[in-house]
Amino acid sequence: MLKFIQNNREITALLAVVLLFVLPGFLDRQYLSVQTLTMVYSSAQILILLAMGATLVMLTRNIDVSVGSITGMCAVLLGMLLNAGYSLPVACVTTLLLGLLAGFFNGVLVAWLKIPAIVATLGTLGLYRGIMLLWTGGKWIEGLPAELKQLSAPLLFGVSAIGWLTIILVAFMAWLLAKTAFGRSFYATGDNLQGARQLGVRTEAIRIVAFSLNGCMAALAGIVFASQIGFIPNQTGTGLEMKAIAACVLGGISLLGGSGAIIGAVLGAWFLTQIDSVLVLLRIPAWWNDFIAGLVLLAVLVFDGRLRCALERNLRRQKYARFMTPPPSVKPASSGKKREAA
């Protein structure tokens, strides 16, 4: 049972999402509706995109804490370009290129300059946040064109154009990691770096690609953010990096690298977003959101750690069982010997 849970973390994450959807339905029947699902999905799109990017980085046994700042910086660039009169396609492509460049810079620091990922991305977190504030002067960007907001307007089955794009990206990333040699290279790099090199995997290039795609996903999340709310505050993206990492951990992405799946990260992002909707249903103040999300994350980490220790004990027991000599069995004295002694 323990091995099944460890090897199928996506199933346990799915069960958690289903339970969190069904149980509040006993309090309010209207909660069990397609409208609720589309509402939660719309709110979860930003975190889903960030979780997909974070998955690539975490699979290579790295971590990126600058994605929130990249999201904010890219959202600001999008708003500035649109207000300067550039067309929406040009502004979006430029924004994605900026995110790709920011992620590439993170990858160079980690893969080529050998700076620990947490240290490098802590530095770029401040750098990108500073660039964002320098561009805006600490002010909000408002007056965005209506065509940007149309990207998040319901298009088909209550899902927006960006929502359908997110679904396509999830399916593509899941296929890429599971079915292609390129995708398996991310797992090999995080599981055994030296072994991957001996197999011919270009581990430095894989890590740079992981950080670059992570930055691109953060830029796309910035576009989604701007299209959903219609303006860009000066604190856009703050704290999103921690939520993205939490979503990945909840979905079974290992902090030690080399294991996990995109679907698990998506379910983790959905679960964290759904917590917010349940708190609204229960009329719990919004400032409890981070506390409860953190509590859930800690519980999952403790459970994951205990599960890992239990599995390691079982593996050791199975490995050394054949070397352990059974205790000598004591045979009862025969009845004949008992009579002779008498």
Swiss-Prot record:
An annotated Gene Ontology molecular function: transmembrane transporter activity
Sequence ranges on the Cytoplasmic membrane side: 35-38, 91-92, 136-154, 234-251, 305-342
Domain of life from the UniProt record: Bacteria
Listed Pfam families: BPD_transp_2
Transmembrane segments: 14-34, 39-59, 70-90, 93-113, 115-135, 155-175, 213-233, 252-272, 284-304
Transcription regulation among keywords: no
InterPro entries: ABC_transp_permease (IPR001851)
One GO cellular component term noted in the UniProt record for this chain: plasma membrane
Membrane topology: Multi-pass membrane protein
Thylakoid is among the record's keywords: no
Subcellular location: Cell inner membrane
Segments on the Periplasmic face: 1-13, 60-69, 114, 176-212, 273-283
Keywords, comma-separated and alphabetical: Cell inner membrane, Cell membrane, Membrane, Transmembrane, Transmembrane helix, Transport
Quaternary state and interactors: The complex is composed of two ATP-binding proteins (LsrA), two transmembrane proteins (LsrC and LsrD) and a solute-binding protein (LsrB).
Function in brief: Part of the ABC transporter complex LsrABCD involved in autoinducer 2 (AI-2) import. Probably responsible for the translocation of the substrate across the membrane.
PANTHER family given in the database record: ABC TRANSPORTER PERMEASE PROTEIN YPHD-RELATED-RELATED, AUTOINDUCER 2 IMPORT SYSTEM PERMEASE PROTEIN LSRC
Family, per entry: Belongs to the binding-protein-dependent transport system permease family. AraH/RbsC subfamily.
Name under which the protein is recorded: Autoinducer 2 import system permease protein LsrC
The species this protein was found in: Escherichia coli O9:H4 (strain HS)
Highest classification ranks of the organism: Bacteria, Pseudomonadati, Pseudomonadota, Gammaproteobacteria, Enterobacterales
Gene: lsrC
